[in-house]
A protein has these predicted regions:
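A conserved acidic beta->alpha catalytic loop
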Residues: 34-45, 58-60
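The conserved acidic donor/metal-binding loop of glycosyltransferases
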Residues: 87-91
Length: 232
């Protein structure tokens, strides 16, 4: 019923959790990993879970313009009508039965974004139950390509201007964003990302927060904890 497309670079920490999340809701879903030349266990984990891995090359750099184009086109040859286009840390809380019900009347699933945060200093992703609403992550990640001819994501895919028969669901489904899973992990991810930013990203300012001082990132993490409420 559904094909899931996700973009990955060195996602060995999140990938198994993401796969388990979607396979528990859509047991027969196909998951396609568009891998940006990962150097960790990302590809190994993907293949061991019967995911298809398709590499894409950006010359060792993060280029949000190329990533936008990939998200706008990677799903068009899918054999299923319903496609889900997301990053590895974006988990949509909808199951097969719910989607079948929505498919009778709607072509895009409406979402409410939540920034999830680990209240403990560990890597136990399954124990992360707290978060806060973030409309920036209320993304249009799940849609029916039989009716949506172009999704037209902007960079980051936070917004889009779809064309075709555009019918958003009345029901709203939570989209959990697992960015704040561990302070040290986040800081190291930011440092790695800052080193890989393309000239196009630097000129546009996209991803500039990855260069923030470590102290600022730790404060943001603690601030998120202070306002988090139980979500799951």
């Amino acid at each position: 019923m559904i094909t899931i497309f996700t973009m990955a670079y060195n996602e060995e920490v999140m990938l198994q959790f993401m796969i388990d999340h979607y396979r528990s809701r859509f047991p027969n879903c196909q998951i396609i990993i568009r891998d940006n030349q990962s150097t960790d266990r990302t590809v190994e984990i993907a293949l061991s879970n019967n995911c298809e891995v398709l590499p894409y090359d950006t010359g060792g750099q993060i280029d949000d313009f190329k990533l936008r184009d990939l998200k706008n086109n990677c799903w068009k040859e899918s054999k299923t009508d319903w496609v889900l286009v997301c990053d590895v840390d974006e988990l949509l809380d909808i199951n097969e039965e719910q989607l079948k019900n929505e498919a009778a009347n709607f072509t895009i699933i409406k979402t409410q974004g939540y920034d999830m945060i680990n209240m403990e200093d560990n890597f136990d992703l399954s124990s992360i139950k707290y978060g806060s609403k973030d409309n920036n992550y209320s993304k249009s990640v799940l849609f029916n390509k039989q009716y949506i001819k172009e999704i037209n994501y902007y960079c980051g895919a936070h917004n889009c201007t779809p064309s075709g028969t555009v019918l958003y669901s009345d029901n709203i489904y939570n989209l959990y964003h697992y960015k704040f899973i561990n302070q040290d992990y986040l800081i190291n991810r930011f440092k790695l990302t800052a080193q890989r930013l393309s000239e196009a990203n630097k000129k546009s300012g996209m991803g500039a927060y990855n260069s923030d001082p470590e102290e600022k990132t730790r404060k943001v993490f603690q601030d998120r904890r202070s306002v988090a409420t139980k979500v799951l």
